[in-house]
Amino acid sequence: MTLVDKFVTHVISESSFEEMDRIYLTNRVLSRVGEGVLEVETNLDKLIDLKDQLVEETVRLETIEDSQTAREILGTELMDLVTPCPSQVNRDFWEAYAYSPEQAIEDFYQLSQKNDYIKLKAIAKNIAYRVPSDYGELEITINLSKPEKDPKEIAVAKLVQASNYPQCQLCLENEGYHGRVNHPARSNHRIIRFEMVGQEWGFQYSPYAYFNEHCIFLDGQHRPMAISRQSFERLLAIVEQFPGYFAGSNADLPIVGGSILTHDHYQGGRHVFPMELAPLQKTFRFAGFEQVKAGIIKWPMSVLRLTSDSKEDLINLADKIFQEWRQYSDSSVQILAETDGTPHHTITPIARKRDGQFELDLVLRDNQTSAEHPDGIYHPHKDVQHIKKENIGLIEVMGLAILPPRLKEEVEQVASYLVGEAVTVADYHQEWADQLKSQHPDLTDKEKALAIVKDSVGAIFVRVLEDAGVYKQTEQGQTAFMRFVEQVGILLD
C-alpha cells in the first residue's frame, strides 16, 4: 500500500472521519506534503511511524526545508487530522467526567499520546535509573528527549522579528498554533478548560514528560507566577478534581524558581516521587490547628508536611506558615528574609490526596546570594555544578534529577577513564574522575565502572539537594528549623 493511502486509512480508523472522507483526507495530506509522495510505498503499520515517514519523504523531495522546525510544523499538522476540535475534546472530557473522572482523564491522556502531542518516541530515549541514598531511593534521568536546534536554526531565530503571539508557551493561544522557528508547533495541541477558585484554567499534558502522566495546569490569563494563599487553595482543588494526580508549584522567585516565571501554572501527574515516601522524622501540632497532623520529613531539603481531612484548615495553616517564612530571619544559620526590600523567602508547595486525606508538603526556599556563592547560597554549589548547575525546581525538589544531555557521553568517558582507556575527560569532570579513580584504582570491567560513575552521579544529586536545603542536616540546622516552627506556634507537650 502507498504511504499516503496507509496514513489516510489510519486517520479514518483513529478519528471520527469515515470512508467517504478518504478523497478529502488524501487531498488534505497532499496539500501539506506535495504530490511527489503519491507513489511512495511503505511497510510501516503505526500511525506515528507513518507520519514520520511522510515528513522525511517531504524533506527528501524538498517540499519543505530540511530543518527541525519545518519537520515539527508538518508533523503536528498531519496529526491534527486525528485530533478532534477543542470544543469536541472538551465536550467528550466533561461528558465522561460526569460518570467517571478517572475515565475522562485516561481518555484525554490516550488522545494526547495517539496524536503525538506527548512525544513517546523521544521520551523513550531518556536514560533513567534509581540510586539508594540516606533519604530513600532517588530517581536520576538524563534528558535526551528534546530535539536540539541546529546552529543554522538558532541563527535564523535571532533574525526573526519578535512576536508577542502567543505571549508564552503556556498561553491558551498555543492551541492549534502553526509554529515558527522560535516557537513550537502546536496544531495538534488541545487544552481542557475548567473553573478553579472562580477563574478559568487549562489542563494539558507535557509533550516531553519527565514522569508518568506529567501534566500542566495553567492560568487562562497570562499572569506571573505567584505563591499565595490562592496557590494552596488551587493545589488542593486540583488533587480533588483530578483523582490520582499530585499537584505542585514551582517557587516564584529567581534562583529557586522554575524556568517559566511569567505565566502562573502548576505541574502534576500520576507518579510517586521519592519525597512522597519520606517518613516524618519529627511530629508536632500547630496551635489553633489541632486537627492537622504536622511534621518535618526526612529529606535533604527543608520540608513541613501537613495532613488533614479539612482543606480549609490546611489552607489556613499553610498560609500562616508561608507568611511567617516570608518575614523570618535567623542570622545564626544565614537565613535572611530580605535585603533592602528585595524578598528572599518563598515556598515550593506540593499537594496530594493520600488515604482519603489531603496532604501539603511545604518546601522552604531562600534565594540569597553571597560572594562565596554568587549563584545562590541555597543552590548547587560550585563543586557539584559539573553535574547540575540549573535551578532546583519542583521536580528535582521531589527527588527526580533532570540532568542535561551532555552527561550521557561524559559519564561514559569518565567510566572509560576509570578502566585506564586513553580518553579525554571534560575539564570540569577531571577532579571528580581522579577522585573516583583513587577510590577504585584497579578497575578493569567497563560495566562495573559505568555503574560506579552512575551511582556517584546519584550521590552528587543528594549533595545538590542538600545545598538547596535552607536548614542543613546537622544538629545546628535541625535545631534552627525547630526555632522557625516554634515561631509559627506549636503546642508544647
From Swiss-Prot:
GO molecular function, one term: UDP-glucose:hexose-1-phosphate uridylyltransferase activity
Pathway(s) it belongs to: Carbohydrate metabolism; galactose metabolism
Main location per the UniProt record: cytoplasm
Subcellular localization(s) per the UniProt record: Cytoplasm
EC number: 2.7.7.12
Record key words, sorted: Carbohydrate metabolism, Cytoplasm, Galactose metabolism, Nucleotidyltransferase, Transferase
Membrane-traversing stretches: none
Cellular component annotations (GO), alphabetically ordered: cytoplasm
Entries under InterPro entries matching the protein: GalP_uridyl_Trfase_II, GalP_uridyl_Trfase_II_CS, GalP_Utransf_C, GalP_Utransf_N
Pfam family for this entry, one: GalP_UDP_tr_C
Keyword RNA-binding carried by entry: no
GO biological process: galactose metabolic process
Family: Belongs to the galactose-1-phosphate uridylyltransferase type 2 family.
HAMAP family xrefs: GalP_UDP_trans (MF_00571)
Protein name according to UniProt: Galactose-1-phosphate uridylyltransferase 2
